[in-house]
Amino acid sequence: MTATEPTFKPFWGKSKHVVVITGAASGIGAATALEVMAQGGTPVLVDCDAEPLADMALRCGPNTLYCVADVTHLDAMHQVVAQTLSVHGQIDVVFANAGVAAFGPLAHVDPSAWRRCVEVNVFGVFNTVRAALPALMQQQGYVLINASVSSFAHPPVMSAYAASKSAVEAMGNSWRIELAAHRVGLGVLHAGWVRTPLVTEGALHPGFVRLRATMPGPLNGESSAPDAARVIVRGMAKRARRVWLPGWMRILFALRALLHMPFAERQLLRAAPEIEALYLEGLAAEGALASSFGPRERERTLQRTRQKR
């Protein structure tokens, strides 16, 4: 066995495997926590939304550990790791899933919304993995990071989301090589549309709805969160390098160079003026922050703004 072909310690067949999941209060994270429980694992739930996180923990079981933390703060993620080790003694898997979206064209998008998207989606992944890394090395564990289909398909008016997810994929490609010598596996999740609060809140933007309407049928399809969770947990068990949702996404990934050729962008180019006009209507009605975030993230941002005053 060469240095480039490391053997990894198996973990999924053990009587106990501890899986830390960020963004676990809802959507993909919540569904994954339930699936981990169904497969006999021990989920640790992390989110910055305290009330829905506590409710989700009760659904997983009365003794389920949950930690209210903002992934953009490295110290907070170190505390999550310390609390997990105090309760469970180990961390076998980390699913860096927490994410938000910003929506709006370059000329009008709220800069704070754009920045927040990058902070959560990029630095949040870094902080999560960095904090848990010593524990993962101890267990020869596995990391899965959520890059989404937007890591290689970059729609207009979602530049922050696309840029952040492209960064996540790049981080994963680098880290996979770095961590192999430490017997830690790393996978990147490339998921299309999943019925989650993030997607539901996006549908409140007429411009977002128009954007999705430009996409051909297969690219506009949605998976349910439970179906997504089954694919994700199966990927964890296999220590997969990449997890595809749906499976045909791997074909699109292989053809990624074609996605931004002129012929492929033609329909988006035609729709772009209408998408921008719809965005501006929302901007006039609600302001830049409201148009750039869904209601959940907007409320979080407003709360943080009040706390700073």
Where are these regions (language model features)?
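Conserved glycine-rich cofactor-binding loop
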Residues: 25-26
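Active-site helix of classical SDR
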Residues: 129, 164
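Residue(s) in the substrate-gating loop at a strand-loop-helix junction
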Residues: 148
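Conserved glycine-rich Rossmann-like NAD(P)H-binding loop of the short-chain dehydrogenase/reductase
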Residues: 39-55
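The beta1-alpha1 cofactor-binding region of Rossmann-like NAD(H)/NADP(H)-dependent oxidoreductases
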Residues: 68-79, 111
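Substrate-binding pocket helix/loop in short-chain dehydrogenase/reductase
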Residues: 105-106, 110-115
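SDR active-site lid
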Residues: 181-249
